[in-house]
Amino acid sequence: GSSDTANVHGERQQKLDLFADEAIRKICDHTGRLCAMASEEHEDIIEIPANFGRGKYVLLYDPLDGSSNIDVNVSVGTIFAIHRKVSGGELGTIDDVLQPGRSLAAAGYVIYGSSTMLVYTTGQGVHGFTLDNSLGEFLLSHPDMTMPKTPVYYSANHGREKFWTPG
């Protein structure tokens, strides 16, 4: 269900949004690899506690994209991007967070459902992994994913058609 709070975009936060955000933050803040994080659910940069050590990467994420569709059983997922730290000092800064996409070290998403998939790239192709529940591990199921030269389908969100420019 809904919480009584809104995210930085003014969208009503779902309780599952907040749970996912806290889970990702708690899983990632103590690795020693990150200098900062930024989430759609927070207005400011999420600092890494000093007692965990700080690294040279920044994690940007939307903990539960599509959460407004939870009650109608449409797929939801987590979107993430990783940048290398560019500023001096130990703490991550706004300059570390607001880098262009071409500077990404890695990016990907996880889509949750009856089959949970992780898709990511580090700039050397896009690879898909499917969660094997019996092992509790993601197994490479879709190596070197690419767009077909001649696509069979085209999809657009007609719910936002009023925002399209004439063309």
Name every feature range the model reports, one short phrase each:
Residues 1-15:
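Conserved phosphate-binding loops in N-terminal lobes of ATP-dependent enzymes
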Residues 5, 18-167:
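IMPase-like, lithium-sensitive Mg2+-dependent phosphomonoesterase catalytic core
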